A protein has these predicted regions:
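Activity-critical C-terminal alpha-helical subdomain
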Residues: 77-135
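Short, surface-exposed loop/strand segments
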Residues: 1-69
């Protein structure tokens, strides 16, 4: 049985990465990937402006799809305004721990077992231009 994975992405770069590199891998495992860029306003997409836009897109996907759907996110950590738990986590020095707590807070806020939030710790575009020997 196949599954569908909707990835709510920040912009065109993440969308292309999901389509061109992730989709073929997941398709081999019976998972169809559908990246969707965050709606920031009526008729506009891209750029992570606020949490409500992200939450609205996630909820729209979860409500309009069946049980065979999983939703995740692909947004940069430094562009995460007003996320649930962000203020409580601001004292955590380890950024990976901070991201994990914020992902958990998003999951708790939306409260649907089909949601697996993912926040990219380092700006995705910066990773594309770094030497692989540095990573």
């Amino acid at each position: 049985m196949s599954k569908r994975l909707y990835i709510v992405v920040e912009g065109q770069t993440e969308e292309e990465f999901a389509k061109d590199l992730m989709a073929p891998y997941f398709l081999d495992h019976g998972i169809y990937i559908y990246p969707t860029i965050i709606h920031t306003s009526r008729g506009h997409k891209g750029g992570f402006v606020n949490y409500e836009h992200l939450k609205n897109d996630i909820n729209r996907l979860l409500k309009s799809q069946g049980e065979d759907v999983v939703v995740t996110t692909f947004v940069d950590f430094f562009r995460c305004p007003e996320l649930p738990g962000a203020e409580d986590c601001s004292r955590i020095q380890n950024h990976a721990e901070r991201v994990a707590k914020i992902e958990k807070a998003i999951s708790d806020d939306i409260n649907d077992w089909r949601l697996y939030p993912y926040i990219q710790l380092h700006e995705f575009e910066a990773l594309l231009f770094s030497g692989s020997f540095l990573i």
